[in-house]
């Protein structure tokens, strides 16, 4: 199971706080000061959970979610914000985020949310590996075996 958490927040104190919390909790945090910083490495970044703030200069958190999904990135995303409201939460959930947390949030809630996201990612990776294995077996079938299978 992956234990990488990508933290994207323009607030340096928040990034450092989350980095410390995640590291102390056994995760491997990677921090970025802006959405563009993460997007620059997103295609080669280690799989894991993404935790992003909504309100950031330049590209905001929801725009980041949209760009990641447009690129085919399906990593679980947790959105955090100090200025949450129902319409914003609905918009984030419709964009495909795994969860929406309003600051201040409890450390335990954040950690449980991240663990749930990483567990789901591990299950998805397991299913993909199994599907790949099945396809490899099917590719080895003779034409007659394929006919029987149909």
What are the residue ranges of the model-derived segments?
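Active-site beta3 strand of CheY-like receiver
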Residues: 6, 45-51
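Acidic catalytic/metal-coordinating carboxylates
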Residues: 33-34, 60-63, 84
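Short amphipathic alpha-helix used as the core "switch/output" element in two-component signaling
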Residues: 37-40, 62-74, 91
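Active-site residues of response regulator receiver
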Residues: 53, 81
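Receiver (REC) domain active-site loop signature in two-component systems and cognate sites
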Residues: 56
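C-terminal output helix
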Residues: 85-87, 101, 105-114
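Helix-turn-helix DNA-binding segment
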Residues: 132-150
């Amino acid at each position: 199971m992956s234990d990488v958490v990508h933290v994207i927040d323009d607030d340096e104190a928040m990034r450092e706080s989350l980095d410390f919390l995640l590291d102390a909790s056994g995760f491997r945090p990677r921090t970025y000061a802006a959405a563009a910083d993460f997007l620059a490495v997103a295609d080669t970044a280690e799989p894991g959970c993404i935790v992003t703030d909504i309100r950031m200069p330049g590209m905001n958190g929801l725009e980041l979610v949209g760009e990641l999904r447009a690129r085919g990135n399906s990593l679980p995303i947790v959105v955090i914000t100090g200025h949450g409201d129902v319409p914003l939460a609905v918009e984030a959930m419709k964009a495909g985020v795994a969860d929406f947390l309003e600051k201040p949030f409890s450390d335990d809630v954040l950690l449980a949310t991240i663990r749930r996201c990483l567990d789901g990612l591990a299950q998805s990776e397991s299913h993909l590996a199994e599907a790949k294995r099945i396809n490899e077996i099917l590719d080895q079938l003779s034409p007659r075996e394929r006919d029987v299978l149909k």
